[in-house]
């Protein structure tokens, strides 16, 4: 890739990142979400992907495209990413406007550049480069990019359920991770999930005088704090009985690989007591 092409890639990413696609503020960003999805779909066509289309929800469409020219015998890679971003609050802490991406030094600064428009764009530029320089991709590729990841992907599960044949693949690649340092990409084995729960504490039927009853009666807040603290052990693991029963443990070769490479990737000595992700 020559310097002119590299500069074009940066300009295209700047255009992509300039769309204010804050999904948590959907009511005021609907046109921006739709415009970004349309731009992304058009870019997929420009780089050589086929069968490009926009899928519901209309407010923040799912963008799909593929390249399946290797035939049914070749493996298929599914690339996932999202074009929505987090809010920019507080805006006065930004050195430059968040949706006017600028290059400073070796970095591009703008909302979404590191989550997830930049990572998503890396894969699109890799596809484009391979198609230009080699005329084909080494495997079949499907791409699915949504606009609701930052609000919990409320429509993604239904889309997957209703399009199993369309999304059938051998490997899925999540373009929403990080790089330990420049030119050293990371392969993430997994991310921590999220579990929401509501805990209600029933206590006294009315207010009690803290001076008269504070020593003998715990407050509801104190009880709640004690319960929350008992959910975790001192090492950060979950203390709820049975919580880890269905968690798949790393295979021996995976654990060995992590031990061998952890120090190189993090510049820290390997801690044998560190729980594997």
Give the ranges of each region predicted by the language model.
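Active-site metal-coordination/substrate-binding segment of hydrolases
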Residues: 74-145
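Generic secondary-structure signature for well-ordered alpha-helical cores
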Residues: 18, 45, 132-135, 164-165, ...
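Flexible glycine/proline-rich, aromatic-decorated loop/lid segments
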Residues: 186-202
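Acidic/histidine-rich catalytic neighborhood of metal-dependent amide-processing enzymes
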Residues: 114-190
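Acidic-enriched catalytic cores of C-N bond-cleaving enzymes acting on peptides and small amides
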Residues: 180, 189, 210-277
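N-terminal helical capping/dimerization or prosegment-like subdomains
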Residues: 1-91
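Short small-residue beta-strand/loop micro-motif enriched in glycine and branched aliphatics
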Residues: 108-110, 205-211
């Amino acid at each position: 890739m020559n310097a002119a092409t590299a500069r074009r890639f940066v300009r295209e990413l700047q255009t992509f990142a300039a769309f204010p696609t804050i999904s948590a503020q959907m009511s005021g960003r609907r046109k921006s979400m739709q415009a970004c999805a349309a731009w992304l779909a058009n870019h997929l066509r420009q780089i050589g992907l086929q069968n490009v289309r926009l899928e519901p929800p209309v407010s923040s469409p799912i963008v799909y495209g593929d390249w399946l020219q290797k035939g049914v015998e070749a493996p298929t890679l599914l690339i996932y990413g999202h074009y929505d971003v987090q809010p920019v609050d507080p805006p006065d802490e930004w050195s430059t406007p968040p949706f006017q991406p600028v290059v400073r030094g070796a970095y591009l600064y703008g909302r979404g550049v590191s989550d997830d428009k930049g990572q998503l764009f890396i894969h699109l530029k890799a596809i484009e480069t391979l198609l230009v320089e080699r005329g084909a991709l080494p495997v079949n590729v499907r791409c699915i990019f949504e606009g609701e990841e930052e609000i919990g992907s409320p429509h993604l599960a239904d889309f997957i359920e209703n399009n199993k044949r369309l999304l059938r693949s051998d490997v899925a690649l999540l373009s929403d991770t990080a790089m330990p340092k420049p030119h050293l990409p990371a392969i993430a084995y997994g991310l921590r999930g999220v579990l929401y729960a509501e805990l209600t504490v029933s206590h006294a039927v009315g207010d009690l005088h803290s001076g008269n009853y504070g020593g003998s009666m715990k407050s509801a807040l104190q009880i709640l704090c004690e319960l929350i603290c008992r959910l975790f052990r001192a090492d950060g693991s979950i203390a709820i009985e049975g919580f880890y029963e269905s968690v798949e443990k790393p295979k021996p070769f995976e654990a060995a690989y992590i031990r061998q490479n952890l120090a190189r990737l993090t510049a820290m000595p390997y801690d044998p007591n560190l729980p594997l992700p």
